[in-house]
């Protein structure tokens, strides 16, 4: 058994992932943060240390259209679709997916699938 809490395990995985993931201007990083109640996605250029676009379940565009709270797979689909549309509007087509130390399952996976369906390539 591990002596680390689940949050500490997630942070450890995230540190390990970030050693290899780096966003550039041509291929920025799509970073996902998942809390208990909401999900957030940002497209980040690590070289310029600049956030190019972002979306979350707290966005005004999504708050009215979401029926449940922001902790469902449907909400993650909406966030993935919105962040992909905003990235494509800025001319970003390819990204590097950063799952933030979370397992690629559930809400993180549904966000990634929705972003792919909307046109982002990763």
Curated annotation (Swiss-Prot):
Region forming the signal peptide: none
Domain of life, per lineage: Bacteria
A Pfam family of this chain: Ribosomal_L18p
Biased composition (Basic residues): 9-21
Sequence segments annotated as region (Disordered): 1-27
Gene3D superfamilies in alphabetical order: 3.30.420.100
Biological process (GO), any one: translation
GO molecular function annotations of the record: 5S rRNA binding; structural constituent of ribosome
CDD domains membership: Ribosomal_L18_L5e
Keyword Coiled coil annotated: no
GO cellular component terms attached to this protein's record: cytosolic large ribosomal subunit
Keywords recorded for this protein, A-Z: Ribonucleoprotein, Ribosomal protein, RNA-binding, rRNA-binding
NCBIfam families: L18_bact
Assembly and binders: Part of the 50S ribosomal subunit; part of the 5S rRNA/L5/L18/L25 subcomplex. Contacts the 5S and 23S rRNAs.
Family: Belongs to the universal ribosomal protein uL18 family.
Function, as annotated: This is one of the proteins that bind and probably mediate the attachment of the 5S RNA into the large ribosomal subunit, where it forms part of the central protuberance.
Name of the featured protein: Large ribosomal subunit protein uL18
Source organism of this protein record: Prochlorococcus marinus (strain MIT 9303)
């Amino acid at each position: 058994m591990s002596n680390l809490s689940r949050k500490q395990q997630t942070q450890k995985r995230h540190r390990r992932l970030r050693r290899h993931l780096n966003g550039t201007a041509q291929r920025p990083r799509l970073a996902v943060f998942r809390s208990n109640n909401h999900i957030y996605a940002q497209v980040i250029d690590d070289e310029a240390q600049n956030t190019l676009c972002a979306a979350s379940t707290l966005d005004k565009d999504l708050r009215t259209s979401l029926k449940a709270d922001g902790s469902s797979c449907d909400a993650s689909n909406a966030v993935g679709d919105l962040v992909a549309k905003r990235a494509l509007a800025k001319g970003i087509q390819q990204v590097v997916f950063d799952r933030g130390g979370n397992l690629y399952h559930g809400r993180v996976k549904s966000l990634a699938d929705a972003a792919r369906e909307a046109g982002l390539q990763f």
